[in-house]
UniProtKB/Swiss-Prot annotation:
Designated name of the protein: Protein VP3
Region (N7-methyltransferase activity): 187-255, 433-559
Biological processes per GO annotation: viral process
Residue span of region 2'-O-methyltransferase activity: 256-432
GO CC annotations on file: viral nucleocapsid
Catalytic activities: a 5'-end diphospho-ribonucleoside in mRNA + GTP + H(+) = a 5'-end (5'-triphosphoguanosine)-ribonucleoside in mRNA + diphosphate; a 5'-end (5'-triphosphoguanosine)-ribonucleoside in mRNA + S-adenosyl-L-methionine = a 5'-end (N(7)-methyl 5'-triphosphoguanosine)-ribonucleoside in mRNA + S-adenosyl-L-homocysteine
Subunit field text: Interacts with VP1. Interacts with VP2.
Biological source species: Rotavirus C (isolate RVC/Human/United Kingdom/Bristol/1989) (RV-C)
E.C. no: 2.7.7.50, 2.1.1.56
Residue ranges, annotated region (GTase/RTPase activity): 560-693
Disulfide bridge map: none
GO molecular function: GTP binding; mRNA 5'-cap (guanine-N7-)-methyltransferase activity; mRNA guanylyltransferase activity; RNA binding
Keyword rRNA processing: no
Length: 693
């Protein structure tokens, strides 16, 4: 949802799913904010004439801090604000739309400039446009700044990594006769326009920036964090991604199997991924990364990296780098290398048609550059090297096997080594071992590191989307969360009907958790993505759905001790239950009647007056488990310890019997729904309350 304030009245009811809210002058800004937040319409319009604007601003501030975007807009912007989802940076008054109507103009938006230098424009019937970070400014004024951030980057990534499985799918085959990139992009755009805009992905690009800059230890970084990692490259941080395969871990046998991976050239993509892999590997050594690139041309991606790294290049063709040597690298240059990283991407043009002779020359050249790498690592400045290798028999260092996709899969892969790796025992490899790796492994993450241990201090830790992984024991994750004092961590929310559900993905699986599993510090907030966004200065328009991809965000030191409702509060609590009541129930009072029936009350004449507020507790437990924005666990614990504070003119303290009745009602609700997870959840809530009692 979104709340839009307008000083000028207009024909705004023509927009679908829009509600005009009438400000109640008899209520405080706090109560008006609550009433606004529980409207079931997507867009809430508030006309501001005749209203105390200071009260409106306070209500909007409360909505925004709870992750519900509320702002006063210009009348001529009503169209885009009501028709598009967006992420609102309410601290700096910046609106980031996630808006794909540029498809009408036959445009294809990318955020990496090197795509402009491929033949992709010849294969697609669209105009390929590049914008740094995908950001297009739509409006800049005193009120706010508007950007559109939607891109087609994810379609390119899916083509590179997932096109075979997608094109072999039944739906694709029913629609298209050929497996072309043109048809693939058309298919992915069809899916997008079929109400499948990747909102979380687009919004996370924005909201991740603030939490990244506040953190020193990052757990589970993946490629979507590349922009934030680059922006913070000169600050102190390291990452743990449990990612990367070393040579000694390779298994299986294979043979040479050339395959065209992409219709358009992705050699620049491969080099960009390889370069970042090396740079972030050195970053994890607590060094300021820099790089010498040997065999750099054409290097269309290098110019955009100069702002983050010192890049020295060697090639007989021109390259836009920090320092370019317009010649080939020689042994004499080894002592002059001043960067701590070296990327070697050399393959000579051998003038022979004899494939055996060519293989012999390639292997000899590979050995030569491997020997040069050893010498480079004797240079006190050089910390790590990523070099091109080929499948061959022999002994090589037990470094990381890096194999980012390129246009044609042949015999090449890359080896990441450092000073420590080359001192360890070398690994004997065979052609067939390496061909199997080349044919089956594709590197999809530029962050390579060891596994994070759930021990020790947690200050400065940011762990988004990873600690739920089954490589960690569930009980140890709960213990870790209970003492967590970092920036933010997440676990996957169990909004299924299966107790202790484990969710499987392509390469791993996740435990699922309930908010009632945790006993964190009272100043720690447990909430949803929307609540997390509000805490860090953002608000989102998308209504949260129970789709198996929901997380519990655990955020220490976030509680406003003087006003519980500032963050992760009951704002928006009734939207879900309102929708169910109006579509499935005979009365809006059904929840309260249900509660009183469970309690055994025979005279329910005053159901709409007595204990009205405790309906919130029932609502929070019975309906909000599937999203968990309202931190009802924190509410229960604070309430009974006498530490609960809220700036509200209508709040009344609940009695012990009211709370018990609300929790029992939620239990019966789940029982009748056949929801075993809900039964467990409500029982645990009663345990939490009784401990506090």
């Amino acid at each position: 949802m979104r709340v839009l304030g307008l000083f000028e009245r207009g024909n705004n009811l023509n927009f679908a799913d829009t509600y005009v809210y009438t400000w109640n002058q008899q209520y405080s800004y706090h109560e008006n904010a609550f009433l606004i937040s529980n409207q079931v319409a997507t867009t809430i319009i508030l006309y501001l004439d005749g209203i105390n604007i200071n009260e409106v601003n306070k209500a909007f501030e409360l909505l925004n801090s709870n992750g519900i975007p509320a702002l006063i807009i210009k009348p001529d912007h009503i169209g885009i604000f009501t028709s598009s989802n967006f992420t609102y940076d309410w601290q700096y008054k910046i609106v980031y739309f996630h808006e794909y109507t540029y498809y009408k103009n036959n445009e294809f938006i990318v955020s990496d400039e090197f795509w402009l230098y491929t033949n992709i424009n010849e294969l697609l019937p669209y105009k390929i446009l590049y914008y740094e970070r995908g950001m297009r400014e739509l409006y800049a004024g005193r009120e706010y700044t508007l950007y559109n951030t939607a891109t087609d980057d994810d379609i390119l990534y899916k083509y590179i990594y997932e096109k075979d499985s997608i094109m072999n799918g039944t739906d694709y085959k029913k629609l298209y006769d050929t497996n072309s990139v043109k048809n693939f992009v058309h298919f992915m755009r069809l899916l997008r326009m079929r109400f499948a805009v990747p909102f979380d992905q687009l919004s996370n690009r924005i909201t991740r920036s603030r939490v990244f800059s506040k953190s020193r230890i990052h757990i589970g970084l993946r490629n979507e964090s590349i922009p934030q990692a680059l922006d913070n490259i000169h600050s102190q941080w390291i990452n743990y991604s449990a990612n990367g395969i070393v040579i000694s871990e390779l298994k299986g046998l294979g043979s040479y199997s050339e395959k065209k991976i992409s219709e358009f050239g992705i050699g620049q993509f491969k080099n960009y991924m390889n370069f970042l892999t090396l740079m972030f590997y050195i970053k994890n050594m607590k060094k300021k990364p820099s790089c010498t690139i040997i065999g750099a041309a054409p290097g269309y991606w290098i110019s955009s990296m100069k702002k983050y790294f010192t890049i020295v290049t060697y090639d007989n063709k021109e390259v836009d780098s920090t320092e370019h040597h317009n010649r080939y690298f020689t042994d004499d240059d080894i002592v002059n290398v001043k960067t701590n990283g070296v990327y070697i991407d050399v393959r000579s043009e051998f003038k022979t048609n004899d494939w055996r002779q060519r293989r012999k020359l390639i292997e000899e050249e590979t050995i030569k550059w491997l020997e040069i790498s050893y010498k480079l690592l004797e240079n006190k400045r050089v910390e790590a090297i990523l070099l091109k290798m080929t499948a061959m028999d022999g002994e090589i260092p037990d470094g990381y096997c890096v194999h980012s996709p390129t246009t044609y899969r042949k015999s090449e892969y890359y080896l990441l080594i450092d000073k420590h790796i080359i001192k360890r025992q070398k690994i004997k490899v065979t052609k067939s071992l390496m061909y199997n790796a080349i044919n089956t492994i594709y590197s999809d993450n530029v962050f390579i590191s060891g596994k994070y241990s759930l021990r020790g201090k947690t200050e400065g830790v940011l762990a988004l989307y990873c600690l739920s992984n089954t490589i960690n024991q569930k009980e140890k994750v709960i213990q870790y969360a209970n003492s967590f004092s970092g920036t933010c961590m997440t676990v996957r929310l169990n909004n299924t009907y299966e107790v202790d559900k484990i969710i499987d993905f392509k390469t791993n699986s996740d435990h699922t958790f309930l908010p009632s599993d945790f006993t964190c510090s009272l100043n720690t907030i447990l909430t949803s993505y929307r609540g997390y966004a509000g805490i860090f200065g953002y608000a989102i328009t998308k209504d949260l759905k129970s789709n198996g991809n929901n997380h519990i965000y655990i955020i220490p030191n976030a509680r406003d001790e003087n006003n519980f409702d500032t963050f992760g509060s009951h704002l928006g609590l009734s939207r879900y239950s309102h929708s169910k009541r109006f579509s499935e129930s005979a009365t809006t009072m059904s929840g309260y009647i249900f509660r009183d029936m469970v309690s055994g009350k025979e005279n329910m004449q005053d159901t709409d007056k007595d204990n009205y507020a405790s309906g919130h507790v029932f609502n929070a437990i019975a309906h909000y488990r599937f999203d968990y924005t309202y931190d009802i666990v924190g509410w229960l614990r604070l309430h009974k310890t006498g530490q609960f504070k809220v700036k509200s003119d209508i709040y009344k303290e609940h009695t012990d019997s009211e709370i018990r009745n609300a929790i029992e009602s939620a239990y019966v609700y789940y029982l009748l729904d056949g929801d075993k997870v809900g039964e467990k959840y409500s029982k645990k809530m009663m345990e939490i309350w009784e401990v506090q009692v």
